[in-house]
UniProtKB/Swiss-Prot annotation:
Binds 2 iron ions per subunit. It comes from the Bacteria. This is 3-demethoxyubiquinol 3-hydroxylase. Transmembrane segments: none annotated. It catalyses: a 5-methoxy-2-methyl-3-(all-trans-polyprenyl)benzene-1,4-diol + AH2 + O2 = a 3-demethylubiquinol + A + H2O. Pathway: Cofactor biosynthesis; ubiquinone biosynthesis. NCBIfam families: DMQ_monoox_COQ7 (NF033656). One of its GO terms (biological process) is ubiquinone biosynthetic process. The lineage of its organism: Bacteria, Pseudomonadati, Pseudomonadota, Gammaproteobacteria, Legionellales. Its main location: membrane. GO terms for molecular function: 3-demethoxyubiquinol 3-hydroxylase activity; metal ion binding. The gene is coq7. It comes from Coxiella burnetii (strain RSA 493 / Nine Mile phase I). Belongs to the COQ7 family. One of its GO terms (cellular component) is plasma membrane.
Length: 215
């Protein structure tokens, strides 16, 4: 989405959001930064190890699909141009993650989640609601989301085969970006979310990570 002060009509906004959805779900994402795993050799994985790596990288890819949807929903409803710019920058970095995960999945011979259209739609609606609740709570939603994502990624680093250095390097870089996104949201005026909202977010994330691992 635009990070300038231009005002879009409802129709313009709908077209832009539809385009963003189609690009995320059906396009080939282009990273602005170099893949951190570039130059690393392909590991010799057993069939079981490869299946495990595919599962976790598929989860990470779906997580990035959700991140794109969340940020676009929040961008569409952000009131402060500075907050909108923060979401725009974060979304661009999440596009890097999306591209890296998709590239790694292709290298492993895996497929992206067949449920990505559902993940995107659900996350976009959540992003809209978060944005409509006001910028402080919307920023709080980002901060809490990134905290939970960082925990998931740390868990993945414990479970991805130790010799799959390519997948591990990508996840490590993603983890650092997510931590920074959370810190940026906090420094921009994030308001802490209610406990029940945090628990609901964790439950939804658990559903996504469980299903995306297999489907």
């Amino acid at each position: 989405m635009s990070n300038n002060s231009r005002h879009y009509s409802a129709i313009d906004e709908a077209i832009l959001q539809g385009q963003a959805m189609l690009e995320t779900l059906f396009g080939k994402p282009v990273a602005q930064r170099e893949n951190p795993a570039k130059g690393l050799s392909q590991p010799a994985l057993t069939s079981a190890e490869k299946k495990q790596s595919i599962g976790f990288m598929r989860v990470n890819h779906s997580g990035e699909v959700c991140a794109q949807a969340l940020y676009h929903g929040q961008m569409a409803t952000a009131k402060n141009p500075a907050v909108r710019a923060l979401f725009t920058t974060a979304a661009k970095e999440e596009t890097d993650h999306l591209a890296w995960c998709q590239e790694r999945l292709e290298e492993l011979g895996g497929h992206t989640s067949y449920l990505n259209a559902f993940w995107y739609t659900n996350s976009f609606l959540i992003g809209l609601l978060a944005g409509l609740s006001g910028d402080p709570l919307s920023l709080g939603f980002v901060e809490e989301t990134e905290k939970q994502v960082e925990i998931h990624l740390a868990d993945h680093l414990r479970k991805i085969p130790s010799n799959d250095l390519k997948s591990r390097k990508i996840v490590e870089y993603m983890q650092q970006d997510e931590i920074q996104h959370g810190l940026n949201a906090r420094s921009s005026g994030a308001k802490e979310l209610p406990y029940l909202v945090k628990k609901l977010m964790a439950f939804q994330a658990k559903v996504m990570t469980t299903l995306a691992y297999w489907i």
